[in-house]
UniProtKB/Swiss-Prot annotation:
Record Pfam families: Pkinase
UniProt modified residues of type Phosphotyrosine: Y173
SMART domains the UniProt entry points to: S_TKc (SM00220)
Active site: D141
Domain commentary: The TXY motif contains the threonine and tyrosine residues whose phosphorylation activates the MAP kinases.
Enzymatic class: transferase
One cellular component term from this protein's GO annotations in UniProt: nucleus
Post-translational changes noted in the entry: Dually phosphorylated on Thr-171 and Tyr-173, which activates the enzyme.
Family listed: Belongs to the protein kinase superfamily. Ser/Thr protein kinase family. MAP kinase subfamily. HOG1 sub-subfamily.
Span of the annotated motif TXY: 171-173
Disulfide bond positions: none
Annotated binding of ATP, by residue: V26, G27, M28, G29, A30, F31, G32, L33, V34, K49
Protein name: Mitogen-activated protein kinase hog1
């Protein structure tokens, strides 16, 4: 049984195993607080993410289970990796990952990026996406604050809590507005890996310009700003809109012509503009894929087809349509944690763990 230590961070109780010391807050998200810490076992700095009340509702339980399964499955140099996971006596879940010094949002607000950094960061984002997409996963919430970077300029994509299966029937608004693909705004349903390419294009443009490309004040304004630059969506894209209200809105907009991006990005490398043109395309089917983008001339200094791996197997989404009670998600979560720590689930300890789920008395680190 692990020994747990409590600390107050921003009024939130962090209850972590004694393996981790020197807690310092580094970020707050909608679903959890992240602290830096030192791993006593390895001597390395780590990030500890507390998932708030993971078992309070079936929806939150499923979301936490999904993020855990994804972090366990996705193993790639440009994806954040899970080094530890545990459930505290208070039944909060903690994910422990490597700690990177900053994120792209902080970098972009501090200074303009030089060309070689823009190239290298974009290359690593696309290299990570090639792997993620090959696993049958769509991130859905790519934005500069989800792109972590260390002092060596190594880049890792994080926060897979919103990620979903590649599925023609996806729903809802999920990504931060500035980076949201038009098909999410227009259809609310049918979208796929291409939404991540659009988001990456918006991030790429922000690296080139030093400010967001489409800073919409709301959803309507967001779409209007997009059409000012990229023109009115083609008819075949408009025909895919499912919502009658959205369809009326789009048809009410004045007809606009697409502006050459070279006019907006006057100081950018022509190859950079060409790649951006291929990423920011209304029709998802005509948008460049991660694999194709990696082979683009702009990324030739870094492109190496022998070192841009795909996933060995697809992610198992069989749980995703399940509508289960909290206690069942809890049992599944504990099972995943036991598996992560290579604990035999047939032994007496794991039996005791399962029996004690309702009371939250059994905890493994």
């Amino acid at each position: 049984m692990a020994e747990f230590v409590r600390a107050q961070i921003f009024g939130t109780t962090f209850e972590i195993t004694s393996r981790y010391t020197d807690l310092q807050p580094v970020g707050m998200g909608a679903f959890g607080l992240v602290c830096s810490a030192r791993d006593q076992l390895t001597g390395q700095p780590v990030a500890v993410k507390k998932i708030m009340k993971p078992f309070s509702t079936p929806v939150l339980s499923k979301r936490t289970y999904r993020e855990l399964k994804l972090l366990k499955h996705l193993r790639h140099e440009n994806i954040i990796s899970l080094s530890d996971i545990f459930i505290s006596p208070l039944e909060d879940i903690y994910f422990v990952t490597e700690l990177l010094g900053t994120d792209l949002h902080r970098l972009l607000t501090s200074r303009p990026l030089e060309k070689q950094f823009i190239q290298y960061f974009l290359y690593q984002i696309l290299r990570g996406l090639k792997y993620v997409h090959s696993a049958g996963v769509v991130h859905r919430d790519l934005k500069p604050s989800n792109i972590l970077i260390n002092e060596n300029c190594d880049l890792k994509i994080c926060d897979f809590g919103l990620a979903r299966i590649q599925d023609p029937q996806m729903t809802g608004y999920v990504s931060t507005r500035y980076y949201r693909a038009p098909e999410i705004m227009l259809t609310w349903q049918k979208y796929d890996v291409e939404v991540d390419i659009w988001s990456t294009g918006c991030i790429f443009a922000e690296m080139l310009e030093g400010k967001p490309l489409f800073p919409g004040k709301d959803h309507v304004n967001q779409f209007s700003i997009i059409t000012e630059l990229l023109g009115t969506p083609p008819d075949d894209v408009i025909q895919t809109i499912c919502s009658e209200n959205t369809l009326r809105f789009v048809k009410s907009l004045p007809k606009r012509e697409r502006q050459p991006l070279a006019n907006k990005f006057k100081n950018a490398d022509p190859d950079a503009v060409d790649l951006l043109e291929r990423m920011l395309v209304f029709d998802p089917k005509k948008r460049i894929r991660a694999t194709e983008a990696l082979a683009h001339e702009y990324l030739s200094p870094y492109h190496d087809p022998t070192d841009e791996p795909e996933a060995e197997e697809k992610f198992d989404w069989s749980f995703n349509d399940a509508d289960l009670p909290v206690d069942t998600w809890k049992i599944m979560m504990y099972s995943e944690i036991l598996d992560f720590h290579n604990i035999d689930q047939g032994n007496d300890a794991s039996q005791a763990l399962a029996e004690g789920l309702g009371q939250g008395q059994q905890n493994f680190a």
